[in-house]
């Protein structure tokens, strides 16, 4: 007798975090999840993009999804407490919290939340992200938000840290013009393609960061159907803005700074008006190895 094993739905089993339909973000808000190789500049990109959206008159919420809780400090000019830390203080009785306990106003009115995460080696970061969205909904803090940006830990695409993809309309992948960054990007494309079968998330495009050239990124895009939405060269003012704990929009308006500001504003406008969902087709590892590099 032959038995058939049915594949579980997305979110069933030990490798996924099941989406609670009651904690979906309201229709109408543009929800963007930012992924990329660890250390590639996702938090810098997310914060400056949030600032750009706010400059366009949008009400913006940025949610940091990294236990390091360093996503939003250039917006708030300080390290803010995490949702998980605040919940622990009240023994996870969220009804005892006020919005000011866990949500903080940053540059130009951008609202900032750091979800935090469980101690190393314990728990699931995706669960924490879900609880953060649930808490925001309980306090009706998403109802008037135009743009939500999830800044996600490293290039981890397990069921837990893929959780923001369950809320997002689009995913932006931050990459440099090098093998390791593009290799990580390919893994992320695979995760998004898997999630797109059951959720609304689609690829929004690529952000080339800290790269003078984009020839290797261009090769990858051509093979996989991706598109570069913005290109930020290795401008020292961006590095210095992190050290000054501020966004690029608060730096002295030199020629380089204005160029970067305009690129972020252009990216924000395109995400609002001109973004086309991309059908990314990830490569096999050997294919990337053979594709990238020089003849």
UniProtKB/Swiss-Prot annotation:
**Presence of keyword Nucleus:** no
Its domain of life reads Bacteria
EC identifiers of the protein? 1.3.7.7
Instruction: Return one GO MF term.
Output: 4 iron, 4 sulfur cluster binding
Q: Which residues bind Mg(2+)?
A: 43
Pfam families xrefs: Fer4_NifH
The enzyme class is oxidoreductase
Q: Could you tell me what the cofactor note in this record states?
A: Binds 1 [4Fe-4S] cluster per dimer.
Recorded hits in Gene3D superfamilies, A to Z, give: P-loop containing nucleotide triphosphate hydrolases
Reaction(s) this enzyme catalyzes, per UniProt: chlorophyllide a + oxidized 2[4Fe-4S]-[ferredoxin] + 2 ADP + 2 phosphate = protochlorophyllide a + reduced 2[4Fe-4S]-[ferredoxin] + 2 ATP + 2 H2O
Listed cofactors: [4Fe-4S] cluster
* Keywords from the UniProt entry: 4Fe-4S, ATP-binding, Chlorophyll biosynthesis, Iron, Iron-sulfur, Magnesium, Metal-binding, Nucleotide-binding, Oxidoreductase, Photosynthesis
The residues listed in the UniProt record as binding [4Fe-4S] cluster, with positions renumbered to this chain, are 124, 158
Where ATP binds, per the record, is at 39-44, 68, 209-210
Instruction: Name its pathway.
Output: Porphyrin-containing compound metabolism; chlorophyll biosynthesis (light-independent)
Q: Which Gene Ontology BP terms does the record give? A: light-independent chlorophyll biosynthetic process; photosynthesis, dark reaction
Q: What protein family is recorded?
A: Belongs to the NifH/BchL/ChlL family.
Oligomer and partners = Homodimer. Protochlorophyllide reductase is composed of three subunits; ChlL, ChlN and ChlB.
Task of the protein:
Component of the dark-operative protochlorophyllide reductase (DPOR) that uses Mg-ATP and reduced ferredoxin to reduce ring D of protochlorophyllide (Pchlide) to form chlorophyllide a (Chlide). This reaction is light-independent. The L component serves as a unique electron donor to the NB-component of the complex, and binds Mg-ATP.
Its protein name is Light-independent protochlorophyllide reductase iron-sulfur ATP-binding protein
Organism of derivation: Prochlorococcus marinus (strain AS9601)
Q: What is the lineage of its organism?
A: Bacteria, Bacillati, Cyanobacteriota, Cyanophyceae, Synechococcales
Question: What is the gene name?
Answer: chlL
């Amino acid at each position: 007798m032959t038995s058939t094993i049915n594949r579980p739905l997305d979110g069933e089993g030990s490798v996924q975090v099941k989406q609670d339909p009651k904690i979906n973000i309201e229709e109408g808000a543009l929800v963007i999840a930012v992924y990329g190789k660890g250390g590639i500049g996702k938090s810098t990109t997310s914060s400056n993009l949030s600032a750009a959206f706010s400059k366009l008159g949008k009400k913006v919420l940025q949610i940091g999804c990294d236990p390091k809780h360093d996503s939003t400090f250039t917006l708030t000019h300080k390290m803010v407490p995490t949702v998980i830390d605040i919940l622990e203080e009240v023994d996870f009785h969220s009804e005892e919290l006020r919005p000011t306990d866990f949500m903080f106003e940053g540059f130009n009115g951008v609202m900032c939340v750091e979800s935090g995460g469980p101690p190393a080696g314990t728990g699931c970061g995706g669960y924490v992200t879900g609880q953060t969205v649930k808490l925001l909904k309980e306090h009706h803090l998403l109802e008037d938000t135009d743009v939500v940006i999830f800044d996600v830990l490293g290039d981890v695409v397990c069921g837990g840290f893929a959780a923001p993809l369950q809320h997002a309309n689009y995913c932006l992948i931050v990459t440099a013009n090098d093998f390791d960054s593009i290799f990580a990007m390919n893994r992320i494309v695979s995760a998004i393609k898997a999630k797109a079968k059951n959720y609304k998330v689609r690829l929004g495009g690529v952000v080339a960061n800290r790269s003078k050239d984009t020839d290797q990124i261009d090769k990858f895009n051509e093979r996989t159907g991706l598109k570069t939405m913005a290109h930020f060269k290795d401008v020292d003012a961006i590095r210095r803005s992190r050290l000054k704990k501020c966004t690029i929009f608060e730096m002295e308006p030199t020629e380089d700074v204005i160029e970067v500001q305009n690129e972020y504003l252009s990216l924000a406008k395109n995400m609002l008006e001109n973004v086309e969902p991309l059908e990314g087709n990830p490569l096999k590892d050997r294919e990337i190895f053979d594709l990238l590099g020089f003849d």
